């Protein structure tokens, strides 16, 4: 009678149990409405509010009912329903946002380090695209009303309204706090010395200083 090596069996069992434990952690309770005042977000989310204090109103949000604040350099309005604005999504692995892009407006190159994004165009049309990390290939396409486009987690991506009417789109994310880093602000809204930025971007010093002034940077 053949015998099965014990070590591979034990290792396989441990890996399986670890995977099950990881995927069921969020199922140990029905929900975990974030207690935002108690501290910052962590890899496992915010601390939960006591269930006895949670009401149906906590699961409702009107955060995306109207356009957000206009970001003038880009002629785009952004409204978010991340965990900070919508505490009920804490620990659920979902969140959403709304973007209203004026004609000629753009959502500039940016990343969501902690989540993938699924974009749905509600009105108008826009060009959506992302840049791969392996070979810097650009994948872009015009997305019309009713169409969707997906952006993989962490990759630089953008939207651009090439039409003559405002484009409205909603996005869903695979994280309650996907994060947001806009490339323009990362480069020009910091205090990194201008000479360093010039070396890293090959832009003229005068242009770097102009952009730092525009985006609130220094140095």
Curated annotation (Swiss-Prot):
Which cellular component appears as one GO term in the record?
Answer: apoplast
Sites of glycosylation? 75
- What sequence ranges are listed for the domain Cupin type-1? 61-209
Mainly localized where?
secreted
Q: Which residues form a coiled coil?
A: none
- One Gene Ontology term of the molecular function aspect: manganese ion binding
Please state where this protein is localized.
Answer: Secreted, Extracellular space, Apoplast
Which species does this protein come from? Answer: Oryza sativa subsp. japonica
Q: Which UniProt keywords apply?
A: Apoplast, Disulfide bond, Glycoprotein, Manganese, Metal-binding, Secreted, Signal
On subunit structure and binding partners, the annotation says: Oligomer (believed to be a pentamer but probably hexamer).
Instruction: Tell me the function of this protein.
Output: May play a role in plant defense. Probably has no oxalate oxidase activity even if the active site is conserved.
Q: Where is the signal peptide?
A: 1-26
Matching Pfam families: Cupin_1
The set of disulfide-linked cysteines is 32-48
Where does this protein hold Mn(2+)? 110, 112, 117, 157
- Name of the protein described by the UniProt record: Germin-like protein 8-13
Which family is this sequence assigned to?
Answer: Belongs to the germin family.
